[in-house]
Amino acid sequence: MEFYPVAIEKLIEEFAKLPSIGKKTAQRLTLHILNLPDDEVREFAKALVKAKGTIKYCSTCGNFTDTDPCALCSNPNRDKSTICVVEQPKDIMTMEKVKEFNGLYHVLHGNISPMQGRGPQDIKIRELVARMNEEVKEVILATNPNIEGEATAMYIAKVLKPLDVKVTRIAAGIPVGGDLEYADEVTLSKALEGRKEI
């Protein structure tokens, strides 16, 4: 038997669908929102609906954007000869915090994971290959240092090998099985500096 009205239970259920949010955290978030002034709740809801309605993926790199192409792809000061390949848009935010990389990005929107039924056709590898031109000299593979990230990096390296582009992998320093999102700036900076050709 639940102690909350149906509307509260539904909100808890929706929050619990978010990554890293369990039932207790979902309950705390729900109760916090219900205790906010009405105008703050309206602003929160408005921001959520606006973000969902206006944010899309950049047609070039796959990052989140409200303009197409995104601010990074359309920035004339970015080094167009280097593309850093990441698994998710959040990884771009992590890389940008380091302030060591001035090239372009490519978001795969996942990784190769046979255990989860994801193959190369399920992520944005074809789109990466389509971006290869004479201007691109290096592709840095910054997939996560876990089994899926390594498999994805090796597959991409194999696909790009005949295209006469240098393919490098970020260096050690990111723990195996770790997630790029949780790496500190110094570690990520060193991993980028020490990248190896594959």
From Swiss-Prot:
Keywords: DNA damage, DNA recombination, DNA repair, Metal-binding, Zinc, Zinc-finger. GO terms for molecular function: DNA binding; zinc ion binding. Residues 81-175 form the Toprim domain. InterPro entries: DNA_Rcmb_RecR, Rcmb_RecR, Rcmb_RecR_Znf, TOPRIM_dom, TOPRIM_RecR. It comes from the Bacteria. GO terms for biological process: DNA recombination; DNA repair. A zinc finger (C4-type) spans 58-73. The keyword Plastid does not apply. Pfam families: RecR_C (PF21175), RecR_HhH (PF21176), RecR_ZnF (PF02132), Toprim_4 (PF13662). Transmembrane segments: none annotated. Belongs to the RecR family. May play a role in DNA repair. It seems to be involved in an RecBC-independent recombinational process of DNA repair. It may act with RecF and RecO. This is Recombination protein RecR. It comes from Clostridium botulinum (strain Alaska E43 / Type E3).
